[in-house]
Regions:
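Short Gly/Ser/Thr- and charged-rich N-terminal loops/segments
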Residues: 83-87, 93, 98-106
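The feature marks the mature, well-folded catalytic cores of soluble enzymes
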Residues: 1-81, 99, 107-338
Length: 338
């Protein structure tokens, strides 16, 4: 069986994920033996999480923050006791100061562990909690998300005096959306799709006779967002302001993948099971090419999917590492000659 294999050239990590993983790896290289705690998965890809876990990155939830603070305190207390016995307390003080300098963060309590905020961003209370626990924070919030958070705060300040409403198109419970809600104390309406929009209007959750402003989670479908905004514009009687907040890198991927899917006989889409962006892009490929298969790793490939002479396209989400795409491509090539 002869197969022609091509990896879509723009597939792989987006800029925000590259930045977050780069900073995590740099910290782990410079602080050998130390643990770096990521608040939530740094990327929604199981294979990449295993790779980073091998280097010392530990994923935790918000409920774990108090525990890592206590572990860091206990470890520091034991360290100080040993240093005191050796008459090297000055060296311990210097080490604590240099830790804050190397991470680029100020920290009044050098006893804390180091916490990484991933590209999705966090609500303000997360930073307050980390500070109260004495944790050193490495903030890897994507610059695109930071701008969106700022825009949402400003919109809320405009809308509140006029009794208006803030609407967010995004996945309920998604880390980025939770971070956005946190900017306005949760006082916004989140809609996941057109059906939810219509339902909210019907039951009074969205008041179309008041000023409205709508934003999108940065990784959502541009086409779906456009349709939702059009529907709202027709119904809003007191005016609506639509904000273009989908990441340009994500938006361009939709057009590129649609074209890529059409010019191949079969598409192998690679992404983690929990990737929201992966679900959206997989469905996009599937609508363009029915012979589209979703896998998380090369071991899930099946020789029965392929036919002699197939042009095989391999692509992935913004959370799919390039090394994994290359691994899948090599595995597909291995079916040739069978």
């Amino acid at each position: 069986m002869n197969l022609e294999v091509e990896i879509e050239r723009h597939s792989g990590f987006c800029g925000g994920v590259i930045r977050a993983i780069g900073r995590a790896e740099r910290f782990l290289e410079e602080h050998s033996g130390e643990t770096l705690y990521s608040l939530g998965d740094i990327v929604h890809n199981e294979a990449e999480l295993r790779r980073l876990g091998g280097k010392g990155l530990v994923t935790i939830s918000k409920e774990d923050l108090g525990n890592i603070s206590k572990r860091a305190f206990d470890g520091k207390r034991r360290f100080d006791r040993l240093v005191s016995l050796s008459n090297h307390s000055d060296r311990s003080h210097s080490r604590s100061l240099s830790l804050s300098k190397r991470t680029g963060q100020s920290n009044n309590n050098s006893q804390g562990a180091t916490l990484l905020i991933r590209a999705h961003g966090e609500p303000p209370e997360t930073y307050s909690l980390a500070e109260s626990l004495g944790l050193t924070v490495i903030d890897c919030t994507c610059p695109v998300v930071l701008r969106l958070q700022k825009s949402i705060r400003e919109a809320y300040e405009r809308l509140k005096p006029a009794g208006g409403q803030l609407i967010i198109f995004g996945k309920i419970g998604h880390a980025e959306v939770l971070g956005l809600l946190g900017q306005v104390g949760g006082d916004a309406v989140v809609i996941e799709n057109m059906a939810m929009l219509l339902s909210k209007i019907e039951d009074g959750g969205i008041l179309t006779d008041r000023p409205l402003e709508i934003f999108s989670q940065t990784t959502k479908s541009p086409v779906e967002y456009s349709l939702i905004c059009e529907e709202l514009s027709v119904r809003a009687t007191a005016g609506i302001k639509v904000h273009d907040t989908i990441c340009s890198q994500v938006a361009s991927r939709h057009e590129e993948l649609a074209e890529f899917a059409l010019r191949h006989d079969i598409i192998i889409f690679v992404s983690g099971a929990s990737s929201s962006n992966g679900k959206v892009l997989f469905e996009l490929c599937k609508t363009r090419n029915p012979r589209t298969y979703h896998i998380s790793e090369a071991a899930e490939l099946s020789a029965g999917w392929f036919s002699d002479g197939d042009k095989v396209g391999i692509c992935g989400a913004t959370s799919t590492p390039g090394w994994l795409l290359a691994q899948v491509a090599e595995a597909v090539k291995g079916f040739s000659g069978r």
